[in-house]
Every structure is written in C-alpha cells, then in structure tokens.
Amino acid sequence: MYNLKDMTLEEMEEFFVNLGESKFRAKQLYKWIYDKRVTDFDLMTDISKNLRAKLKEIAYISELKIIERRVSQIDDTVKYLFLLEDKNIIEGVAIKYKFGNTACVSTQVGCNMKCKFCASAIGGKVRDLKASEMVDQVMAIDSDYGKISNIVLMGSGEPFDNYDEVMKFIKIVNNPYGLKIGKRHITISTVGIVPKIYQFADEELQVNLSISLHAPNNELRNELMPINRAYPLEELMKACRYYIEKTNRRITFEYALIDGVNDKKEHAYQLVDLLKGMLCHVNLIPINYVKEIGFRKSNNEKVMMFKKIIENAGITCTVRRELGSDIEAACGQLRRKYLKEG
C-alpha cells in the first residue's frame, strides 16, 4: 500500500499518470490531505467514484496517534508521544513564541550520535523516520496545539543521518499545495556530519542551519560528541564557512552549558577564536537534567559571563529560555521514561 503522505507533489503526479489519470489529480489530493485534512477517500467528492475505489485498493493516508500529551505549567510548552504504525514511539514538542507556534520534530526513532548529554542517545537508533512520519508530527501538533508557523528539526535523531527523507519532508511541508510553511521558517539542526553540510549548501535552499557545537576544542568535543572523532572542528568549521559563502545565510551554533564541563572562561574565549569572522549567531542552552547522565546546567552567573565574553567579541548571542522543564521536554526524556515504565 502506498502512503500518499510519502509523496512530493511531483511524485504524486507521476503516481497518477502511471494509473492512467491526469497529473492534476495530485493537486486535488494535496488539497484534500493538507488543506482539508481529509484521510477518507470516500469524502473526496470532486474525485470520481472509480478512482476513489482504485485508491482504496492501493493507497492510504496516514495519521499519527497521540498516546501522551503533557502541558507545561510554566510556559505552555506541550510534549507529545506519538505511536507509529510499527508500534515504535517518537516525541514531538509544541512551543509558543511571540512570532508564532513552533513544532519541534523528530527525524529518527532514537539516535546513533551518542552525544554524552542527550537522552535520545541512550539505547541508540532504532530506525529512520519516513517523510510522512515527520509530516504527520507537524499535522498532529497543528491540529492539537494551534496553527504551526515554524518547524525545527531538533527532536530525537540526527537529520543529516536521514538526509533524503528530511529533504523530501521539506519539499512536502513547503509546497504551496502542501502545508505552505516557508523555507525560512524551517530549521535543521545537525551535530556536524561534514559531507552532508556541503551537500546541503549545494541544495541552495533558504532553510536555516543550526550546528550542535557544545565544545570549543577537539579534546572536549571528542569526549562529549563522538562524531567529532570522524569530523574534527577544523573540518566542521571549513564546511560551515563553505555553507555561508554558498548561501549567504547565517549559521546558529548551539552550545549547551554543562556545569564544570564546558562553561569556563577559557572555553568562552576558545569559542570566540573558533567562530571569529563568521556570519553566525550563538545560542546558549541551559542543559536539561537527565537522571541517567548526571550532567547539570551551569548557574546563571556562569551563563551571563559566557554570554558577555561572546558579545564583547562582536558575535551575537542569546540564551535560550528553558522550555518545558517540568514535563521532560528535552530530546528523548519522555520517550525513555514511557518505555521504562512499559
């Protein structure tokens, strides 16, 4: 059975041509699926009964089931657990900002990157998500939480480790017949898979790129993020500079501050040296406490010291507000708790 949500508009046009139908049927189906949110072919009244019958035999339109929904009493952040068709479980998050609602989307079940501070890494990667499963997260959050205007691929998983499905997902949500979310309202976050950064730069999309950096030198980054052993900082920075030159777009560097690990003055100065002259922004993140890992966030005094050093060097810097700390909104936390409790 074909899941129609796994098809870009061009793929769906080809699908209908192969059925002996006109390719304009694809736009009709896209409208039913993404505008009217209809999953029952019998309700698609501008499509002939014969074609509806044929579609029921060979295709379906997926939906995600919400199995848990936690609302933060602090900031209205909502954490979702979704049940996939194969009974795997993934997380999504809805975040309210002044400029609109953001959906934080997972790209894999679990993650293989083994970052030492991340709950998603505990247990490793189970499998990649299909484009439809990413689309369904956005649509489920949109239906439950309210209109989604921004997407961040910062949930569980490494987007560039599932590159082709992520690119397909972007095409579907960005399509004017799809979810109509502008590319500049979509952000991809990567730990730094260098060949994929070059490939992504060459796509010349207007999608935002965020790099999970978290350490200013190779020794510390090797310890915190094993990906650095494959692609050390020199290679990562070279790829980032290529991306900026190719796209003329700013990169955001994410830096999770961990008490006593990467939050010293020397680390801030090393970070400044690393990013000097780049079109970039630094986003400091107070890390979420994960019991199995044991890292704790830096205190406010250290965060402000770190921020001041970066800003004094002429690099823009913000501190991300803590989101959903009362509902285990960090990557992988709620899923792991749910699986442990059975």
UniProtKB/Swiss-Prot annotation:
Q: Name one GO cellular component term.
A: cytoplasm
Report the GO molecular function annotations.
4 iron, 4 sulfur cluster binding; metal ion binding; rRNA (adenine(2503)-C2-)-methyltransferase activity; rRNA binding; tRNA (adenine(37)-C2)-methyltransferase activity; tRNA binding
Q: Per the similarity annotation, which family is this?
A: Belongs to the radical SAM superfamily. RlmN family.
Alphabetically list the UniProt keywords: 4Fe-4S, Cytoplasm, Disulfide bond, Iron, Iron-sulfur, Metal-binding, Methyltransferase, rRNA processing, S-adenosyl-L-methionine, Transferase, tRNA processing
* Principal subcellular localisation of the protein: cytoplasm
> What is this protein's gene name?
rlmN
* Residues the entry annotates as binding S-adenosyl-L-methionine: 157-158, 189, 212-214, 288
Show the SUPFAM superfamilies listed in the entry.
Answer: Radical SAM enzymes
List the catalysed reactions.
Answer: adenosine(2503) in 23S rRNA + 2 reduced [2Fe-2S]-[ferredoxin] + 2 S-adenosyl-L-methionine = 2-methyladenosine(2503) in 23S rRNA + 5'-deoxyadenosine + L-methionine + 2 oxidized [2Fe-2S]-[ferredoxin] + S-adenosyl-L-homocysteine; adenosine(37) in tRNA + 2 reduced [2Fe-2S]-[ferredoxin] + 2 S-adenosyl-L-methionine = 2-methyladenosine(37) in tRNA + 5'-deoxyadenosine + L-methionine + 2 oxidized [2Fe-2S]-[ferredoxin] + S-adenosyl-L-homocysteine
Tell me the Gene Ontology biological-process terms attached to this UniProt entry: rRNA base methylation; tRNA methylation
This entry's comment on the bound cofactor is: Binds 1 [4Fe-4S] cluster. The cluster is coordinated with 3 cysteines and an exchangeable S-adenosyl-L-methionine.
Q: What is its EC number?
A: 2.1.1.192
Protein name per the record: Probable dual-specificity RNA methyltransferase RlmN
The active site of this protein is located at 91, 331
Q: Write down the species.
A: Caldanaerobacter subterraneus subsp. tengcongensis (strain DSM 15242 / JCM 11007 / NBRC 100824 / MB4) (Thermoanaerobacter tengcongensis)
Q: Which cofactor does it need?
A: [4Fe-4S] cluster
The protein's job, in short, is:
Specifically methylates position 2 of adenine 2503 in 23S rRNA and position 2 of adenine 37 in tRNAs.
